[in-house]
């Protein structure tokens, strides 16, 4: 009867759970981290190290966090934690953007607009309370993601100190000569009732009317003369324009041509029986005339646009208004007619060219911009014939204007087209350019544009195309409109002269005095402040500005209001946000940083893509393809979410679906099972007593430490360049190939069958200990909860948190002058694969049931055979086969052959050996197992 030898084996044993059960375990860990003050402990432990500052871009304090928030915060957390492990002190101060329209809208829905139920001060207080509640909700979910930071002391743009620092920052911008005021066309949202910054605009398709409108010549003969022709009697001349915004025609003050463009004078459609010639860009004449129903292009003359400069036209429906032909660089012959109707109140290029020609001084503000903040024509807007425009909304006016012009002879063509059009990012509604008095940060008057473009070149951009993207945006952007006509925000805090409109000559000094008061009482102080307190006898000559600052200025000055205020270095080491922030926070921060200090506020800038489903579609409620981070954490755990984020190529769109989550859960199990196997085989191992020195290790153990060292070099370099997908892939490959398919499989025999304290067994345990110590650190930035759990189960002293440690220093490469080098091991592993290929068909045809039932013969050249023959007694352990014989042969190739063994099987180690039964005390054991149980035990040198 077979004796039971199980008690003589050293099988794996660990209390580290096989199942992660993350949704239950993670909250308990969070409670402990909170209770123990983990972030403060980690900072204290890192005191005195070099600083690495990842500055948090503030999410808006409104609504629950979504998957994009989770991606952003987890990427930041991975970097921060990897920096602690790399030997840095990496403070992370989370922040929130708290002012602005979405919060105002939320309060308006509940209490109405200012003045209905609440006065302005009460309204601001409700906004403050609402934002604070939203911060608490978001903070809870951010913590649940496993993100560590100064959650008890975040920065909030609504804090009195921040608001005061923002006013101080604006004063610095003004001191450096960047502030200007003017009546300029700005992006205007009629729903917001306020100007918008570039970053508050998004583009969407819109169906717009298109019209070709003829502007009749005041002196047709003069225009004909510019083309070198004489006009036949009774022939009219007109210049047609093409536009998608008929509502701007009441504000039309000029028609722009391209100075160097070629124009032709062509026969157009008759005007109520009278012949009419048209001035059209030569490249567009055929297309334009086709729109007007004219088949043949009959050309009467050619001229450059410059030849027509300042000749006069008549407005198409305000006959008394002279419309000069002017020259503008913005005119092209790509589409339309080559002539651009110019309304300086409704377009930046129109404004600039009109200013050059002195047109703005000839007209009233109401003529330049005849619409109010709601998008309605002013009462002073003249009618179009019998059609009243005053009080009409511009989006309704398009059709009204077209209908009114149909029988006048000036409407040459009308149609519709779908095109990309600017919309408000909050309301998703079309916006318009509208000339209003605003405060701007000028891109030119103190060289801000040029300085910003230089600063961009000093920054390391991830991905690299980010540099060209933001440079293009800076190069083409208009002045930054920083004023808003709203209630909830930081006041511009300027006093302006009642007659001249000029800021007080001591403006920045006064602003700093206001900031001192705001720091104590918040922004309400500005509205209750008696100007005489600061201005004395001058108070009667000055008004307080009631405009507030653009929220992008709020977040744009965090480098000053947070970093400098908290004693952190500036520029920050890294800004990290979504790819839309090239036109948002990256840009506003860059402009304020350069305006204040002439340097970019960041050394590195990293962007990530947006989340989409497995088909590449944007996640939305309407499609039903959204996946909320809260649901992932509730069902799978935060570590699965973190693993997906780390493994995705975040430089592009990031796909997520239930199937992708399942694959990540499977990958997580592979990592966890590897850790559990390592821990199981470290049972009874104390590194203080049992650690075998690297030079004394069995060859294969020394090799796996060498491989771990190579992997750590790769992983730490990848963390340093933020390539987390490479890290995850390398870890999974190491677990599957180096450990799972090779090392752990081969060493089972030693670990299970050798005497507990045998050097060969302790050597394997030592190698596994080194791997486990390194492994827990490798995964810690990504799998924060699992790493914390694993840390507690490692042998030896492991107090505190894995983030108290740095990258493991117990690994080392194999010496190049060793008797057998890593290259020799690689050749033996290639031989192992060759053996496996030979055994595969033998298993398939039933010649053997397992590799242990096959005896192997390896034939190699004399030099190789001589190198391998000393190992031949142990090669069976590497191959997990029967006995191995190495022979020399006259060949350059290596040949492997195998045959079924006829030797008996040892019931303890399962090896087939001739020595089975040689000891009468253990008739079913091989001599090796008898020695391991009763005697001195076997010796292992190689495998």
From Swiss-Prot:
Give the cofactor note.
Binds 1 zinc ion per subunit.
GO BP, sorted A to Z: isoleucyl-tRNA aminoacylation
Keyword Cell cycle in annotation = no
The UniProt GO MF terms for this protein read:
aminoacyl-tRNA deacylase activity; ATP binding; isoleucine-tRNA ligase activity; tRNA binding; zinc ion binding
Q: Any idea which positions bind Zn(2+)?
A: 906, 909, 926, 929
Q: Which cofactor does it need?
A: Zn(2+)
Q: Which reaction does it catalyse?
A: tRNA(Ile) + L-isoleucine + ATP = L-isoleucyl-tRNA(Ile) + AMP + diphosphate
Sequence positions that bind ATP: 621
Q: Which UniProt keywords apply?
A: Aminoacyl-tRNA synthetase, ATP-binding, Cytoplasm, Ligase, Metal-binding, Nucleotide-binding, Protein biosynthesis, Zinc
Pfam families annotated for this entry?
A: Anticodon_1 (PF08264), tRNA-synt_1 (PF00133), zf-FPG_IleRS (PF06827)
State the family named in the UniProt similarity comment for this chain. Answer: Belongs to the class-I aminoacyl-tRNA synthetase family. IleS type 1 subfamily.
Record function comment? Catalyzes the attachment of isoleucine to tRNA(Ile). As IleRS can inadvertently accommodate and process structurally similar amino acids such as valine, to avoid such errors it has two additional distinct tRNA(Ile)-dependent editing activities. One activity is designated as 'pretransfer' editing and involves the hydrolysis of activated Val-AMP. The other activity is designated 'posttransfer' editing and involves deacylation of mischarged Val-tRNA(Ile).
Protein name, as recorded = Isoleucine--tRNA ligase
> Which lineage is the organism of this entry classified under, starting from the top rank?
Bacteria, Pseudomonadati, Pseudomonadota, Gammaproteobacteria, Lysobacterales
